[in-house]
């Protein structure tokens, strides 16, 4: 399993809305993530900075990257762009992190 972590952010006034939308995640999106090999996907919020820390375990980089090409993912990005900094394709602005320690 490949461990990935990345940072995103949410608008300060949208913390509750971000959580609400994820509490009601679309079943088709959750199924798509699972079918593409995503496991143990967690997103944490630092309310003081509005920074999001995401962690996911994936089966392969290719399958993970293919999620972005699905229609449901593109719809989710469009749905979220009003509360997050987004790229021109509506994907959230994110920064992939490098692992510097792991204790199995």
From Swiss-Prot:
Compartmental location: Cytoplasm
GO cellular component terms listed in the entry, alphabetical order: cytoplasm
MF terms in GO: L-rhamnose mutarotase activity
Name of the molecule in the record: L-rhamnose mutarotase
Major localisation: cytoplasm
Role: Involved in the anomeric conversion of L-rhamnose.
Entry annotation: catalytic residues: 22
Annotated source species: Tolumonas auensis (strain DSM 9187 / NBRC 110442 / TA 4)
Assembly with partners or alone: Homodimer.
